[in-house]
Amino acid sequence: MNALELINIGETELRQKKIESFRLDSELLLSKILNKKREQILINLDQKISQKKFFMYKRLIQRRSKNEPIAYIMEEKEFWSKNFLVNKDTLIPRPETELMVEKIIEIFKEKRISILDIGTGSGCILISLLSELNNSKGLGIDISKKALIVAKKNSEKHKIQSNIKFLNKSLDAKFNEKFDLIVSNPPYIKS
């Protein structure tokens, strides 16, 4: 079986399950299995796929067909032009959150500030801000120790370790230090 045939199989299954981005998702899942960029696969659709990779791909297609978010299956999500690790212990960054990051950078772009990120999750907001606001520092807090592990990995991945800390604290935690900016983007509550 080649890459095109496998993508078509995945596309058919996802379409039948009413997954809107059936073609893109089937291509992305194959890129994960083959550990290649999607574009590399698309220019070499006749490449042969092993039976082992076929079964791995089918498992990912099954997860997606049950409406598991593609970001959790891929274990990453792009935010502020960077790829962030995500998993079920973190929320998936939303595109509209980038508007908040953009506004904050506009306001503080020439300043050195101290930032508190409440409910940091994957750390994407704080890491994105610190990558743009030179010499600023940040503290990300979260009640989930597992989310903080992901946030720390993301800070290492994006080389923002020297001016960032993560602590397992709740919203009502007290801090000795003062912050110039407090950010938070908690999950939406369904009404």
Kindly give the residue locations of the regions a language model identified:
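A general structural signal for well-ordered alpha-helical segments in protein cores
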Residues: 7, 26-27, 57, 67-70, ...
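Conserved AdoMet
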Residues: 32-106
